[in-house]
A protein has these predicted regions:
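Helix-loop-strand module that forms the ligand-binding subsite of alpha/beta enzymes
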Residues: 1-75
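Glycine-rich phosphate/pyrophosphate-binding loop and the adjoining helix
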Residues: 77-130
């Protein structure tokens, strides 16, 4: 984890790609997010934020969408001095052969402090998925 923290500390921008499981982060992603906790106690969350992008992949069809995944990633990355600025929805756009079959939708994030539970405003995408 020391090497991962060094890479995170040196990064000007972070790009995260994660599948969505039951509306949230899979265990491997959750383990990484949990390991960002020391940044919280070090006060890093108060520093200047660096941009982060989240690419969401999966088969789709979950009626609960993936708002929980976005919230988890947004909160944890904030502790490490990143601001989730883009969320790209690839759910249902990668075929069984691993080929991309369409363009990602860019989701519109609500500003922090608003009703983030609603996920996104109507627009380019929805955290409810297709």
């Amino acid at each position: 984890m020391v090497q991962v923290r060094e890479l995170i500390d040196d990064a000007e921008e972070l790009i995260v790609v994660s599948p969505v499981y039951f509306s949230g982060a899979p265990s491997q992603m959750k383990a990484l997010l949990d390991r960002l906790q020391p940044y919280f106690w070090a006060g890093a969350r108060h520093g200047e934020k660096r941009p982060a992008t989240l690419h969401i992949v999966g088969e789709g069809g979950d009626p609960h969408g993936y708002g929980a995944l976005v919230g988890e990633v947004r909160s944890a990355l904030s502790c490490a001095c990143f601001s989730l600025t883009r969320v790209l929805d690839w759910v249902g756009r990668i075929d069984e052969a691993g080929e991309i079959s369409g363009e990602a939708d860019e989701l519109v994030l609500e500003p922090l402090g608003s009703a983030f539970d609603d996920g996104v405003r109507a627009g380019a995408g929805s955290l409810q998925g297709p």
